[in-house]
């Protein structure tokens, strides 16, 4: 089933800091609200899911009196079979800019897709942060795929008797237990840097204006800020303690410029872009052991790298094209993952009308802490599975563990450290 995406106040801008700079505008019509049915998680239930998530989050500093509202922040997709606009997910914002949560509208998927304790998020923020359009699209694809995998897994279950119940699935009901956090690593990176002033104060002048630093330079600089290396480059000394405390330090702008030059930045006023393949060589020239080339996204590699105290660079594209069978990607963004937590719960499946457990399975969820390189905007925890549209949720089943064909070329550069070979 094809889906088309539209939402209120959104002009669909695709990635701007990319291998090839291209901004695409697509006309759209406002989507009117639809009646909520049992097919969808209601707004009221979405708020309850946020409150439950906070209650079970042992590290959360959120107070119980914080009020969340959804208002008109609803992302819709077009069902081309029914010609209806159906809700895909909601954005619940806390009072006074004290955080937000992205909640799936599908009752069959993980409720909380993303969670942050700072700032608010609006669909119209895509006008300033164009890469959000790509991210919202990813969420929709993940929800669709997770629906499919969850249905398959719940039928299969963990009991040898379960395949015999495939045709009798309506006669069973699931009763999930409470989530329990099993592991957490707090964010490694303390800075919240961006692409404009003061970070671009040493960038080239174009028509009297400073070029943007580019997301490649911002992500790379933030990873270096954690390792506090190199001690200097190209005649500029890096006092990391001062630079992390004071982003107006001239050394910060010089760091961004040095990185930009090394990755062969295509400087621009509206967007600066560089190829992701140039990132490993930049690290090597600035004193690091050369990281491997960008590799296919794997949440397990991201988590393993974070456990080794190595923040991970993540790259993605919003446009995939093909010419004579040759694929290529356009319009990209680069960001950082530097922390994570895992939680799990047991789900018991009962035959309707019986109190005896027929079979059980375990659901596991990993949330990655992401630093988007937007001066701290939208930094928070995001469900790890959304970055691979072909993967289902983390179930102990070969059916859900297969690697999918991710349409947006999401790649990672893990295990970045300062040890020279």
Language-model features, listed with the residues they occupy:
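Noncatalytic regulatory segments and standalone regulatory/sensor domains
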Residues: 29-42, 46, 54, 77-174, ...
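Active-site-adjacent substructure of cysteine-protease-like catalytic cores
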Residues: 78-97, 293-366, 371
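Structured segments of extracytoplasmic/periplasmic soluble domains
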Residues: 52-57, 106, 218-230, 285-286
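Sec-dependent bacterial lipoprotein signal peptides
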Residues: 1-15
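Surface-exposed patches in mature extracellular/periplasmic domains of secreted proteins
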Residues: 61-66, 229-240, 290-297
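Bacterial Sec-dependent N-terminal signal peptides
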Residues: 11-37
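Predominantly the structural core of cysteine protease catalytic domains
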Residues: 213-217, 221-225, 251-341
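Active-site-adjacent structural segments surrounding the nucleophilic cysteine of cysteine proteases
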Residues: 20, 115-121, 125-272
């Amino acid at each position: 089933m094809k889906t088309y995406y539209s939402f209120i106040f959104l002009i669909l801008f695709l990635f701007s800091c990319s291998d090839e700079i291209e901004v695409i505008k697509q006309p759209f019509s406002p989507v009117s609200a639809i009646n909520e049915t049992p097919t969808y998680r209601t707004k009221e239930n979405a708020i309850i899911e946020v409150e439950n998530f906070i209650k079970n989050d042992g590290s959360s500093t959120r107070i119980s009196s914080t009020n969340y509202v959804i208002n008109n922040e609803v992302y819709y997709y077009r069902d081309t079979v029914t010609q209806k606009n159906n809700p895909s997910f909601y954005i619940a914002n806390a009072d006074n800019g004290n955080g937000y949560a992205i909640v799936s509208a599908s009752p069959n998927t993980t409720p909380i897709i993303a969670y942050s304790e700072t700032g608010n998020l609006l669909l119209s923020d895509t006008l300033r942060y164009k890469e959000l359009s790509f991210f919202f699209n990813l969420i929709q694809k993940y929800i669709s795929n997770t629906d499919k995998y969850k249905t398959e897994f719940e039928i299969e279950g963990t009991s040898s008797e379960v395949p015999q119940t495939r045709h009798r699935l309506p006669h069973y009901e699931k009763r999930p237990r409470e989530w329990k956090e099993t592991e957490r690593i707090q964010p490694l990176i303390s800075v919240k840097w961006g692409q404009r002033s003061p970070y671009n104060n040493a960038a080239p002048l174009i028509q009297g204006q400073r070029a943007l630093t580019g997301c490649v330079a911002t992500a790379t600089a933030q990873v270096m800020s954690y390792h506090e290396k190199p001690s200097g480059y190209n005649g500029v000394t890096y006092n990391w303690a001062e630079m992390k405390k004071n982003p107006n330090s001239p050394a910060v702008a010089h760091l961004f410029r040095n990185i930009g030059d090394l990755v062969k930045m295509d400087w621009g006023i509206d967007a600066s872009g560089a190829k992701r393949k140039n990132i490993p060589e930049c690290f090597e020239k600035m004193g690091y052991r050369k990281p491997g080339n960008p590799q296919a996204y794997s949440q397990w590699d991201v988590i393993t790298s974070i456990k080794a105290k190595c923040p991970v660079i993540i790259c993605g594209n919003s446009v995939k094209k093909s010419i004579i069978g040759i694929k290529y990607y356009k319009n990209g963004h680069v960001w950082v993952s530097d922390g994570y937590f895992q939680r799990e719960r047991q789900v018991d499946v009962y035959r309707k009308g019986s109190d005896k457990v027929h079979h059980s399975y375990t659901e596991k969820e990993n949330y990655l802490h992401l630093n988007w390189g937007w001066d701290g905007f939208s930094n928070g925890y995001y469900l790890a599975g959304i970055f691979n549209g072909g993967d289902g949720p983390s179930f102990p089943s070969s059916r859900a563990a297969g690697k999918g064909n991710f349409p947006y070329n999401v790649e990672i550069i893990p295990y970045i450290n300062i040890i020279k070979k």
